[in-house]
Amino acid sequence: MNNAGHGPTRRLRGLGVLAGVALLAALWLLWLLGSAPRGTPAPQPTITILVWHWPFTDQPPELPSDTCTRYGIARCHLSANRSLLASADAVVFHHRELQTRRSHLPLAQRPRGQPWVWASMESPSHTHGLSHLRGIFNWVLSYRRDSDIFVPYGRLEPHWGPSPPLPAKSRVAAWVVSNFQERQLRARLYRQLAPHLRVDVFGRANGRPLCASCLVPTVAQYRFYLSFENSQHRDYITEKFWRNALVAGTVPVVLGPPRATYEAFVPADAFVHVDDFGSARELAAFLTGMNESRYQRFFAWRDRLRVRLFTDWRERFCAICDRYPHLPRSQVYEDLEGWFQA
Protein backbone atom coordinates (compact mmCIF):
# COMPACT_ATOMS: atom_id res chain seq x y z
CA MET A 1 0.00 0.00 0.00
CA ASN A 2 1.28 3.43 -0.95
CA ASN A 3 1.35 5.89 2.06
CA ALA A 4 3.00 8.78 0.22
CA GLY A 5 -0.02 11.13 0.55
CA HIS A 6 -0.54 10.58 4.27
CA GLY A 7 2.39 12.73 5.45
CA PRO A 8 1.01 16.16 4.53
CA THR A 9 -2.45 15.19 5.72
CA ARG A 10 -1.16 14.16 9.12
CA ARG A 11 0.82 17.36 9.42
CA LEU A 12 -2.28 19.44 8.63
CA ARG A 13 -4.31 17.53 11.20
CA GLY A 14 -1.58 18.11 13.77
CA LEU A 15 -1.53 21.81 13.07
CA GLY A 16 -5.33 21.91 13.42
CA VAL A 17 -5.16 20.20 16.80
CA LEU A 18 -2.49 22.62 17.97
CA ALA A 19 -4.56 25.61 16.81
CA GLY A 20 -7.59 24.28 18.65
CA VAL A 21 -5.61 23.78 21.83
CA ALA A 22 -4.18 27.29 21.54
CA LEU A 23 -7.66 28.75 21.05
CA LEU A 24 -9.01 26.92 24.10
CA ALA A 25 -6.04 28.09 26.15
CA ALA A 26 -6.63 31.69 25.07
CA LEU A 27 -10.31 31.48 25.95
CA TRP A 28 -9.48 29.94 29.33
CA LEU A 29 -7.00 32.74 30.04
CA LEU A 30 -9.54 35.38 29.10
CA TRP A 31 -12.09 33.75 31.40
CA LEU A 32 -9.58 33.80 34.26
CA LEU A 33 -8.81 37.46 33.68
CA GLY A 34 -12.50 38.32 33.50
CA SER A 35 -13.38 36.50 36.69
CA ALA A 36 -10.42 37.78 38.68
CA PRO A 37 -11.21 40.34 41.38
CA ARG A 38 -11.14 43.82 39.95
CA GLY A 39 -9.38 46.69 41.58
CA THR A 40 -11.25 49.52 43.28
CA PRO A 41 -12.73 51.79 40.58
CA ALA A 42 -11.21 55.21 40.29
CA PRO A 43 -13.09 57.73 42.44
CA GLN A 44 -15.31 60.17 40.57
CA PRO A 45 -14.06 63.76 40.69
CA THR A 46 -15.88 66.31 42.80
CA ILE A 47 -17.87 68.85 40.79
CA THR A 48 -17.51 72.47 41.91
CA ILE A 49 -20.50 74.76 41.38
CA LEU A 50 -19.85 78.46 41.91
CA VAL A 51 -22.89 80.59 42.81
CA TRP A 52 -22.02 84.07 41.55
CA HIS A 53 -24.92 85.89 43.22
CA TRP A 54 -26.79 84.27 46.08
CA PRO A 55 -30.51 84.85 45.43
CA PHE A 56 -32.05 87.92 47.09
CA THR A 57 -29.16 88.59 49.48
CA ASP A 58 -25.57 89.79 49.63
CA GLN A 59 -24.82 87.33 52.43
CA PRO A 60 -24.82 83.72 51.23
CA PRO A 61 -25.48 81.01 53.82
CA GLU A 62 -22.74 78.83 55.19
CA LEU A 63 -21.78 76.17 52.67
CA PRO A 64 -19.85 73.38 54.43
CA SER A 65 -18.26 70.64 52.35
CA ASP A 66 -21.17 68.26 52.99
CA THR A 67 -23.87 70.73 51.90
CA CYS A 68 -25.02 68.71 48.89
CA THR A 69 -24.57 65.37 50.65
CA ARG A 70 -27.41 66.43 52.94
CA TYR A 71 -29.66 66.39 49.89
CA GLY A 72 -28.46 63.00 48.67
CA ILE A 73 -26.01 64.36 46.08
CA ALA A 74 -22.41 63.20 46.49
CA ARG A 75 -19.17 64.66 45.12
CA CYS A 76 -20.66 68.13 44.74
CA HIS A 77 -18.96 71.23 46.11
CA LEU A 78 -21.19 74.30 46.31
CA SER A 79 -19.40 77.61 46.85
CA ALA A 80 -20.03 81.36 46.74
CA ASN A 81 -16.30 82.16 46.68
CA ARG A 82 -15.71 84.13 43.49
CA SER A 83 -11.99 83.40 43.55
CA LEU A 84 -12.95 79.94 42.25
CA LEU A 85 -14.13 81.35 38.92
CA ALA A 86 -11.14 80.02 37.01
CA SER A 87 -11.46 76.48 38.37
CA ALA A 88 -15.21 75.97 38.86
CA ASP A 89 -16.85 73.26 36.76
CA ALA A 90 -19.92 75.46 36.30
CA VAL A 91 -21.07 78.91 37.42
CA VAL A 92 -24.71 79.66 38.21
CA PHE A 93 -26.29 83.12 38.04
CA HIS A 94 -29.64 83.98 39.60
CA HIS A 95 -31.58 86.24 37.27
CA ARG A 96 -32.97 88.75 39.77
CA GLU A 97 -29.45 90.08 40.37
CA LEU A 98 -28.82 90.30 36.60
CA GLN A 99 -32.17 91.80 35.69
CA THR A 100 -30.94 95.29 34.91
CA ARG A 101 -27.21 94.96 34.32
CA ARG A 102 -25.43 92.53 32.06
CA SER A 103 -22.24 94.14 33.39
CA HIS A 104 -22.68 92.05 36.55
CA LEU A 105 -21.41 89.08 34.52
CA PRO A 106 -17.65 88.36 34.62
CA LEU A 107 -17.51 87.92 30.85
CA ALA A 108 -13.88 88.99 30.45
CA GLN A 109 -12.70 86.49 33.07
CA ARG A 110 -14.78 83.54 31.86
CA PRO A 111 -12.62 80.47 31.24
CA ARG A 112 -13.00 78.98 27.79
CA GLY A 113 -15.58 76.18 27.72
CA GLN A 114 -16.89 76.79 31.25
CA PRO A 115 -20.66 76.09 31.44
CA TRP A 116 -22.77 78.95 32.77
CA VAL A 117 -26.20 78.32 34.25
CA TRP A 118 -29.10 80.78 34.22
CA ALA A 119 -31.40 80.25 37.23
CA SER A 120 -34.86 81.63 37.94
CA MET A 121 -37.99 80.40 39.70
CA GLU A 122 -40.09 83.41 38.64
CA SER A 123 -42.66 83.47 35.86
CA PRO A 124 -41.96 85.21 32.53
CA SER A 125 -44.35 87.99 33.59
CA HIS A 126 -41.94 88.92 36.38
CA THR A 127 -38.68 88.27 34.53
CA HIS A 128 -37.19 91.20 32.64
CA GLY A 129 -33.95 92.00 30.85
CA LEU A 130 -33.53 88.65 29.08
CA SER A 131 -32.88 90.32 25.73
CA HIS A 132 -29.46 91.41 27.08
CA LEU A 133 -28.43 87.83 27.80
CA ARG A 134 -28.26 86.35 24.31
CA GLY A 135 -25.58 83.78 23.60
CA ILE A 136 -24.21 83.66 27.16
CA PHE A 137 -25.74 80.74 29.02
CA ASN A 138 -25.37 77.04 28.33
CA TRP A 139 -27.94 75.61 30.73
CA VAL A 140 -31.14 76.69 32.45
CA LEU A 141 -32.29 75.90 35.99
CA SER A 142 -36.00 76.55 36.53
CA TYR A 143 -39.43 75.09 37.31
CA ARG A 144 -40.00 74.40 33.61
CA ARG A 145 -40.04 70.67 32.90
CA ASP A 146 -37.97 71.19 29.75
CA SER A 147 -35.19 72.96 31.67
CA ASP A 148 -31.73 71.45 31.65
CA ILE A 149 -31.92 71.36 35.45
CA PHE A 150 -35.59 70.91 36.32
CA VAL A 151 -36.37 71.99 39.88
CA PRO A 152 -40.08 72.12 40.72
CA TYR A 153 -41.47 73.95 43.73
CA GLY A 154 -42.62 70.59 45.03
CA ARG A 155 -43.57 67.04 44.12
CA LEU A 156 -45.31 63.99 45.52
CA GLU A 157 -43.18 61.06 46.65
CA PRO A 158 -44.14 57.51 47.69
CA HIS A 159 -45.03 57.23 51.34
CA TRP A 160 -45.56 54.16 53.51
CA GLY A 161 -47.33 54.21 56.81
CA PRO A 162 -50.37 56.03 58.09
CA SER A 163 -50.95 59.51 56.74
CA PRO A 164 -51.19 62.35 59.26
CA PRO A 165 -54.76 63.13 60.29
CA LEU A 166 -56.48 66.00 58.55
CA PRO A 167 -57.02 69.08 60.70
CA ALA A 168 -60.61 69.85 61.62
CA LYS A 169 -62.25 72.19 59.13
CA SER A 170 -64.45 74.95 60.49
CA ARG A 171 -64.30 77.46 57.62
CA VAL A 172 -64.86 77.44 53.87
CA ALA A 173 -62.10 79.10 51.85
CA ALA A 174 -58.90 81.06 52.43
CA TRP A 175 -56.51 83.05 50.28
CA VAL A 176 -53.12 84.49 51.21
CA VAL A 177 -52.02 87.29 48.88
CA SER A 178 -49.32 89.91 49.31
CA ASN A 179 -49.42 91.67 45.95
CA PHE A 180 -53.01 92.28 44.90
CA GLN A 181 -53.34 93.97 41.51
CA GLU A 182 -56.73 94.46 39.89
CA ARG A 183 -55.30 93.84 36.42
CA GLN A 184 -54.30 90.28 37.32
CA LEU A 185 -56.59 87.43 36.38
CA ARG A 186 -56.55 86.11 39.94
CA ALA A 187 -57.87 89.43 41.26
CA ARG A 188 -60.70 89.48 38.73
CA LEU A 189 -61.66 85.90 39.55
CA TYR A 190 -61.67 86.65 43.26
CA ARG A 191 -63.98 89.63 42.67
CA GLN A 192 -66.35 87.33 40.77
CA LEU A 193 -66.25 84.64 43.46
CA ALA A 194 -66.70 86.89 46.49
CA PRO A 195 -70.48 87.43 46.13
CA HIS A 196 -71.06 83.65 46.09
CA LEU A 197 -68.33 82.25 48.34
CA ARG A 198 -67.02 83.31 51.74
CA VAL A 199 -63.27 83.76 51.27
CA ASP A 200 -61.10 84.90 54.18
CA VAL A 201 -58.20 86.88 52.73
CA PHE A 202 -54.85 87.08 54.52
CA GLY A 203 -51.56 88.71 53.62
CA ARG A 204 -50.06 92.17 53.32
CA ALA A 205 -52.50 93.12 50.56
CA ASN A 206 -55.39 92.86 53.03
CA GLY A 207 -53.61 94.12 56.13
CA ARG A 208 -53.67 90.64 57.68
CA PRO A 209 -50.11 89.31 57.26
CA LEU A 210 -49.27 85.84 58.51
CA CYS A 211 -45.90 84.94 60.02
CA ALA A 212 -43.98 82.15 58.30
CA SER A 213 -44.92 79.60 60.95
CA CYS A 214 -48.54 80.77 61.07
CA LEU A 215 -49.53 80.28 57.45
CA VAL A 216 -49.93 76.49 57.30
CA PRO A 217 -51.86 76.07 60.60
CA THR A 218 -54.12 78.98 59.67
CA VAL A 219 -54.96 77.63 56.22
CA ALA A 220 -55.42 74.14 57.68
CA GLN A 221 -58.69 75.30 59.27
CA TYR A 222 -60.26 75.79 55.83
CA ARG A 223 -61.83 73.29 53.45
CA PHE A 224 -60.45 75.04 50.37
CA TYR A 225 -57.52 77.27 49.52
CA LEU A 226 -57.34 79.56 46.48
CA SER A 227 -54.05 78.51 44.88
CA PHE A 228 -54.16 81.36 42.37
CA GLU A 229 -50.84 81.99 40.62
CA ASN A 230 -49.93 85.64 40.00
CA SER A 231 -49.58 84.85 36.29
CA GLN A 232 -50.42 81.90 34.09
CA HIS A 233 -47.47 80.31 32.34
CA ARG A 234 -46.16 76.94 31.26
CA ASP A 235 -45.44 74.67 34.28
CA TYR A 236 -45.65 77.61 36.70
CA ILE A 237 -47.00 75.92 39.86
CA THR A 238 -45.59 77.46 43.02
CA GLU A 239 -45.68 77.13 46.79
CA LYS A 240 -49.24 78.48 46.65
CA PHE A 241 -50.20 74.98 45.57
CA TRP A 242 -47.62 72.74 47.23
CA ARG A 243 -47.20 74.34 50.66
CA ASN A 244 -50.17 76.63 51.18
CA ALA A 245 -52.69 73.95 50.19
CA LEU A 246 -51.34 70.39 50.04
CA VAL A 247 -49.01 70.61 53.04
CA ALA A 248 -51.71 72.43 55.00
CA GLY A 249 -54.13 69.59 54.35
CA THR A 250 -56.73 71.54 52.41
CA VAL A 251 -58.06 71.26 48.86
CA PRO A 252 -56.41 73.62 46.36
CA VAL A 253 -58.64 75.53 43.96
CA VAL A 254 -56.14 76.26 41.21
CA LEU A 255 -55.69 79.05 38.70
CA GLY A 256 -52.54 78.54 36.68
CA PRO A 257 -51.49 76.34 33.77
CA PRO A 258 -54.00 73.89 32.24
CA ARG A 259 -55.36 70.93 34.19
CA ALA A 260 -53.11 68.54 32.26
CA THR A 261 -50.04 70.25 33.71
CA TYR A 262 -51.23 69.77 37.28
CA GLU A 263 -52.06 66.14 36.51
CA ALA A 264 -48.43 65.62 35.49
CA PHE A 265 -47.55 66.29 39.14
CA VAL A 266 -50.50 65.09 41.23
CA PRO A 267 -53.57 62.83 40.86
CA ALA A 268 -56.47 64.31 38.93
CA ASP A 269 -58.73 64.17 42.00
CA ALA A 270 -56.35 66.07 44.31
CA PHE A 271 -57.45 69.58 43.30
CA VAL A 272 -60.21 71.70 41.79
CA HIS A 273 -59.35 73.56 38.57
CA VAL A 274 -61.22 76.77 37.77
CA ASP A 275 -61.21 75.87 34.07
CA ASP A 276 -63.66 73.05 34.79
CA PHE A 277 -66.44 75.57 35.42
CA GLY A 278 -68.27 77.95 33.14
CA SER A 279 -68.45 80.77 35.68
CA ALA A 280 -67.39 81.81 39.16
CA ARG A 281 -70.95 81.18 40.32
CA GLU A 282 -70.76 77.54 39.14
CA LEU A 283 -67.43 77.10 40.91
CA ALA A 284 -68.80 78.53 44.15
CA ALA A 285 -71.88 76.28 43.95
CA PHE A 286 -69.67 73.22 43.51
CA LEU A 287 -67.53 74.09 46.53
CA THR A 288 -70.36 75.00 48.88
CA GLY A 289 -72.63 72.13 47.82
CA MET A 290 -70.07 69.38 48.28
CA ASN A 291 -70.90 66.65 50.80
CA GLU A 292 -68.32 65.19 53.17
CA SER A 293 -67.88 61.94 51.25
CA ARG A 294 -67.02 63.81 48.06
CA TYR A 295 -64.73 66.15 49.96
CA GLN A 296 -62.70 63.31 51.48
CA ARG A 297 -61.98 61.88 48.03
CA PHE A 298 -59.67 64.81 47.40
CA PHE A 299 -57.30 63.36 50.02
CA ALA A 300 -57.09 59.76 48.78
CA TRP A 301 -53.50 60.41 47.61
CA ARG A 302 -52.35 60.97 51.21
CA ASP A 303 -52.56 57.22 51.89
CA ARG A 304 -49.64 56.53 49.55
CA LEU A 305 -47.93 59.84 48.79
CA ARG A 306 -46.44 62.78 50.63
CA VAL A 307 -45.41 66.30 49.64
CA ARG A 308 -41.76 67.19 49.29
CA LEU A 309 -40.95 70.88 48.97
CA PHE A 310 -37.94 72.33 47.14
CA THR A 311 -37.64 75.75 48.74
CA ASP A 312 -33.95 75.82 49.72
CA TRP A 313 -31.67 77.39 47.13
CA ARG A 314 -28.83 75.18 48.32
CA GLU A 315 -30.74 72.08 47.28
CA ARG A 316 -31.75 73.70 44.01
CA PHE A 317 -28.13 74.51 43.13
CA CYS A 318 -26.88 71.09 44.21
CA ALA A 319 -29.21 69.62 41.58
CA ILE A 320 -26.80 70.96 38.95
CA CYS A 321 -24.27 68.32 40.00
CA ASP A 322 -26.86 65.59 39.60
CA ARG A 323 -27.48 66.58 35.98
CA TYR A 324 -23.94 67.72 35.15
CA PRO A 325 -22.66 64.50 33.47
CA HIS A 326 -25.68 64.39 31.16
CA LEU A 327 -25.77 67.98 29.92
CA PRO A 328 -24.39 69.14 26.53
CA ARG A 329 -21.26 71.26 26.92
CA SER A 330 -21.61 72.91 23.51
CA GLN A 331 -25.20 74.09 23.98
CA VAL A 332 -25.80 77.86 24.04
CA TYR A 333 -29.09 79.73 24.51
CA GLU A 334 -28.86 82.22 21.67
CA ASP A 335 -32.38 83.50 22.45
CA LEU A 336 -33.01 82.89 26.14
CA GLU A 337 -35.92 85.33 26.14
CA GLY A 338 -37.65 83.54 23.27
CA TRP A 339 -37.25 80.18 24.98
CA PHE A 340 -38.52 81.36 28.36
CA GLN A 341 -41.44 83.33 26.98
CA ALA A 342 -42.63 80.40 24.84
Swiss-Prot record:
Pathway listed: Protein modification; protein glycosylation
Membrane topology: Single-pass type II membrane protein
Free-text tissue specificity from the UniProt record: Leukocytic/myeloid lineage cells.
GO BP terms, alphabetized: CD4-positive, CD25-positive, alpha-beta regulatory T cell differentiation; ceramide metabolic process; embryo implantation; fucosylation; inflammatory response; L-fucose catabolic process; leukocyte migration involved in immune response; leukocyte migration involved in inflammatory response
Compartments it resides in: Golgi apparatus, Golgi stack membrane
Activity regulation comment: Inhibited by NaCl. Inhibited by GDP in a concentration dependent manner, with an IC(50) value of 93 uM. Also inhibited by GMP and GTP. Inhibited by N-ethylmaleimide. Activated by poly(ethylene glycol) by enhancing the thermal stability of FUT7. Activated by Mn2+, Ca2+, and Mg2+. Both panosialin A and B inhibit activity with IC(50) values of 4.8 and 5.3 ug/ml, respectively. Inhibited by gallic acid (GA) and (-)-epigallocatechin gallate (EGCG) in a time-dependent and irreversible manner with IC(50) values of 60 and 700 nM, respectively.
Positions of disulphide bridges: 68-76, 211-214, 318-321
UniProt key word Transmembrane helix: yes
Enzyme Commission number(s): 2.4.1.-
Keyword terms, alphabetized: Disulfide bond, Glycoprotein, Glycosyltransferase, Golgi apparatus, Membrane, Signal-anchor, Transferase, Transmembrane, Transmembrane helix
GO cellular component: Golgi apparatus; Golgi cisterna membrane; Golgi membrane; membrane; trans-Golgi network
Topological domains, Lumenal: 37-342
InterPro entries assigned: Glyco_tran_10_C, Glyco_tran_10_N, Glyco_trans_10, GT10-like_C_sf
Record topology, Cytoplasmic segments: 1-14
Upregulating conditions: By T-cell activation. Up-regulated by LIF. Induced by IL1B. Induced at higher levels by interleukin 12 in activated T cells. Down-regulated by IL4.
Temperature curve summary: Optimum temperature is 37 degrees Celsius.
UniProt keyword Chloroplast, yes or no: no
Molecular function in Gene Ontology: 4-galactosyl-N-acetylglucosaminide 3-alpha-L-fucosyltransferase activity; alpha-(1->3)-fucosyltransferase activity; fucosyltransferase activity
Reactions listed under catalytic activity: an N-acetyl-alpha-neuraminyl-(2->3)-beta-D-galactosyl-(1->4)-N-acetyl-beta-D-glucosaminyl derivative + GDP-beta-L-fucose = an alpha-Neu5Ac-(2->3)-beta-D-Gal-(1->4)-[alpha-L-Fuc-(1->3)]-beta-D-GlcNAc derivative + GDP + H(+); a neolactoside IV(3)-alpha-NeuAc-nLc4Cer + GDP-beta-L-fucose = a neolactoside IV(3)-alpha-NeuNAc,III(3)-alpha-Fuc-nLc4Cer + GDP + H(+); a neolactoside VI(3)-alpha-NeuNAc-nLc6Cer + GDP-beta-L-fucose = a neolactoside VI(3)-alpha-NeuAc,V(3)-alphaFuc-nLc6Cer + GDP + H(+); an alpha-Neu5Ac-(2->3)-beta-D-Gal-(1->4)-beta-D-GlcNAc-(1->3)-beta-D-Gal-(1->4)-[alpha-L-Fuc-(1->3)]-beta-D-GlcNAc derivative + GDP-beta-L-fucose = an alpha-Neu5Ac-(2->3)-beta-D-Gal-(1->4)-[alpha-L-Fuc-(1->3)]-beta-D-GlcNAc-(1->3)-beta-D-Gal-(1->4)-[alpha-L-Fuc-(1->3)]-beta-D-GlcNAc derivative + GDP + H(+)
Pfam families: Glyco_tran_10_N, Glyco_transf_10
TM segment ranges: 15-36
pH dependence, entry free text: Optimum pH is 7.5.
Glycosylation sites recorded in the entry for this protein: 81, 291
Stated role: Catalyzes the transfer of L-fucose, from a guanosine diphosphate-beta-L-fucose, to the N-acetyl glucosamine (GlcNAc) of a distal alpha2,3 sialylated lactosamine unit of a glycoprotein or a glycolipid-linked sialopolylactosamines chain through an alpha-1,3 glycosidic linkage and participates in the final fucosylation step in the biosynthesis of the sialyl Lewis X (sLe(x)), a carbohydrate involved in cell and matrix adhesion during leukocyte trafficking and fertilization.
Official protein name in the record: Alpha-(1,3)-fucosyltransferase 7
Species of origin: Homo sapiens
Lineage: Eukaryota, Metazoa, Chordata, Craniata, Vertebrata
